[in-house]
Amino acid sequence: MLALAACASSGTQQATVQPGLGPEIPPAIKPQEITGRWGLAAFHNPQDLKRTETAARNGCKQAYNIAMGPTGGVIMHMPDKAQPEELRLKGGPGNKTFIGPQGEPAGGPQDREITSFDGRVMTVKFLDPEVSSRYGTQIYVRCAPRA
């Protein structure tokens, strides 16, 4: 969409392009599907995937808890933040699902993409290259229910 604004006092015209926001795409994965207790580990080298999954499974001794937020999101940590906050699951083209702050489009620089999810194991990659270089690819392995 192109919007034209005219300035009557100077006689000049300025064109402003307003980006069109398409309809919001629902996420392929629902917040309720990722809530619960997870073992968590990360890797930088793809060859370390299986070893890291085993480490994540062992991480259930000190599980990372993903809870439902008060407005339908999930409570998780943003990079470099001590306190967890409510984040949104956002849908993207190609049936992708992202986790990130509300109010930002899916696939934004603060988002992480769920690259794999089978209900038991979830693989997540940060989109910001600098953050990804520090945190690596995260693997969450669902922990058994407490006895």
Give the role of each language-model region:
Residues 51, 55-57, 83, 91-93, ...:
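General N-terminal targeting signals
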Residues 21-73, 132-135:
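Short, solvent-exposed loop/hinge segments that bridge or flank secondary-structure elements
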Residues 3-6:
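C-terminal motif of bacterial Sec signal peptides marking the signal peptidase cleavage site
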Residues 8, 59-61, 142-144:
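Sequence contexts marking disulfide-bonded cysteines in secreted/extracellular proteins
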Residues 1, 13-16, 46:
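Intrinsically disordered and other compositionally biased segments
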Residues 61-65, 84-86, 111-112, 137-139:
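Well-ordered beta-strand positions in beta-sheet-rich domains
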Residues 12-24, 96-147:
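Beta-sheet ligand-binding and adhesion/scaffold domains
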Residues 43-46, 69-119:
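Contiguous, well-ordered beta-strand patches that form the walls/edges
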